[in-house]
Amino acid sequence: MPNPFVCRVIASIFLLIFSQQIQAAELTIDVLDSTGSPIENAVVYAEPDNKSSIPAANAIIEQRGKQFNPLVSVVQAGTDVTFPNFDSVRHHVYSFSPAKTFELKLYSGVPTSPVKFDKAGTVVLGCNIHDYMVAFIHVVDTPYFAKTNKLGKAVLRDLPNGNYTLKAWHYALAKEKEIVEKQVLVKESQTIVMPLSLKPFMIPAKK
């Protein structure tokens, strides 16, 4: 006959897991410009009032075809990023951004160590050899983040119920340091529109 105490413990664990699943919601965010057109590659993220203990995951930004891939990345503060070079030529990756200043001098293949991005902010990447190579890393203080697709949509999943500051960023913001934000109470899944004002911005053409 099963031990009643063990049965109660198991039941409590299942109840806890089930209740957490019920309380988790998702936000669908539509990011639009001043004409109502969708914005691709916008970063959206939700900062909870109570700090999350979810650890940062690792990330990869490739160099392939003398371009960074992806153009835009979003990572949680504390993330280790690896910069593999798959080209037949060497690259010299660097950034002078206040959020992370670093350089990986001329190399091919995979660097021996990743770069840790431990401060929130925007990091602009370049190559000291190919000045048309550019990419952006937006470092955030939350595990709840996503990037918009061609339809301007992004989904933040598994958000515990509570109060959040929802923020949106894009590398072509009209006011470079003015991140758009909204206060959001998450109790159930919902769709939110985030308007952004962008300035003309041309990614350098590959030579």
Predicted regions and their residues:
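Structured interaction patches on ligand/partner-binding surfaces of diverse proteins
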Residues: 103, 108, 140-147, 171-193
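A short, amphipathic beta-strand motif
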Residues: 27-33, 44, 83, 152-154
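A short, solvent-exposed beta-strand micro-motif common in secreted/extracellular proteins
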Residues: 44, 79-85, 162-173
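Short, ordered, surface-exposed loop/turn motifs in non-cytosolic proteins
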Residues: 35-51, 55-56, 88, 131-136, ...
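A glycine-anchored, Pro-Gly-centered beta-turn/N-cap motif
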Residues: 121, 160-163
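A short, Gly/Thr-enriched small/hydrophobic beta-strand-prone motif that recurs across taxa
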Residues: 23-34, 200-207
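Short, acidic Ser/Thr/Gly-rich low-complexity loop/linker segments typical of extracellular
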Residues: 56-67, 71-75, 106, 144-151
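Short, surface-exposed beta-strand/beta-hairpin micro-motifs centered on an aromatic residue
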Residues: 112-114, 151-158
